[in-house]
Amino acid sequence: MFKKKEQEVVSVEERIDYKYSEDRILKELAEYIDKTYNAHYSHNKFQATEFIMDSGHGEGFCIGNILKYSQRYGKKDGKNRNDLLKVIHYGIMALHTHDTQEKN
């Protein structure tokens, strides 16, 4: 049998003139997320985040981290941009949790 080809995330057929650098920021976000999979926490056999998500507390965990990093933004030297990337990453994880719960 043939395997269904996955859809591309970004359309290359039509070039959109983004006003707020969304294309560049989405690329940067993807690179940031990729790096989290190679971070020092990811080398452990079990991840705390996975335990939390698998035990049904993922949505609250993600929302809590969104609040934490949103409130911290602008208060930590040199890490402000990373705080915003973390907010978006936890937002994506919250969407994943939401979508997974909606399917069940």
Predicted stretch roles:
Residues 1-104:
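Intrinsically disordered, low-complexity regulatory regions
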